[in-house]
Each structure stands twice: as C-alpha cells, then as structure tokens.
C-alpha cells in the first residue's frame, strides 16, 4: 500500500480493515484464547493507524457480535438461541450484507481511522449463559 499512488486529495493510499469480535470485551467462559486474540486485534488498531498515517494509510477494526456466518452455523441451536435472547435490537443475528455495508462505509469515509467499530445491535454477552 505504501507504494500505491494517493487516491484522494488528502493523500490517502488505502485502508486496512481488521475483524475483531465483541468477545474482545465480552468474552465468555472457555473463550480465553479467542477473546485474547480478538482483543489483540482491537488493541492493534490505533497504534497501527498512527504508524501508517504518514503513508496515508488508515486502519479500522470491525467488532461484530452474533452474525450469520460459517462459524455460527456450527453452534449448537441452544447456544445460538441463548445469544439471540441477549440481543437488544434488532433481536436476531447480523446479516452478512450489514457487515459488508459497514466495511464499505469504512472504505468510503476517510475520517474513520484508528477506531474499533462495534457492530452488535447493542448486544453485551453475559458472563454466563
């Protein structure tokens, strides 16, 4: 990306979009490694944005909660149902196109930089299910 020609009048050369998870801040019992790895991605966001700013490269992380995905298809129905019960609004898993819509907004909006964007319908995972 550093070698890219600037794409905008501000000199932007691109954006790195990373994916974390609501588990970075709301990890469940048994998710120590998963939560730690997603927390590491979230923690990387601001320092990476600062390091790459001089090159005109942005860094943003999207932290989704429960979304329809290959991973959630593997969840037992009971677990998925209990997670859906703690969704505030909308009361359903996120849709892939909703994730894509946010990713597109990140690409298009140069002021989004160095941020972790929760995409979670106000869901906060309980400490126990």
Regions found by a protein language model. Give the residues of each.
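Catalytic Tyr-x(3-8)-Lys segment
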Residues: 78-98
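Active-site helix of classical SDR
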Residues: 37
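Alpha-helical segment proximal to the catalytic Tyr-Lys
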Residues: 49-54
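C-terminal substrate-recognition "lid" of short-chain dehydrogenase/reductases
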Residues: 95-119, 124
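Short, flexible catalytic-loop segment of classical short-chain dehydrogenase/reductase
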Residues: 25, 59, 63-74
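A short helix-coil junction within the Rossmann-fold of NAD(P)-dependent oxidoreductases
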Residues: 1-12
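Residue(s) in the substrate-gating loop at a strand-loop-helix junction
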Residues: 21
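Active-site loop immediately N-terminal to the catalytic Tyr-X3-Lys motif
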Residues: 26-32, 91
């Amino acid at each position: 990306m550093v070698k890219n020609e600037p794409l905008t009048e501000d000199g932007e050369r691109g954006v790195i979009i990373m994916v974390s998870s609501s588990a970075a801040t709301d990890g469940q019992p048994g998710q120590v490694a998963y939560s730690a790895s997603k927390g590491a991605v979230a923690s990387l966001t601001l320092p990476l944005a600062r390091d790459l700013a001089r090159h005109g490269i942005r860094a943003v992380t999207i932290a989704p909660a429960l979304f329809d995905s290959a991973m959630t298809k593997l969840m037992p129905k009971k677990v998925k149902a209990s997670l859906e019960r703690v969704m505030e609004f909308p009361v359903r898993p996120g849709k892939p196109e909703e994730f894509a819509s946010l990713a597109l907004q990140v690409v298009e909006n140069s002021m989004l930089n160095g941020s972790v964007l929760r995409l979670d319908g106000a869901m906060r995972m309980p400490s126990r299910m």
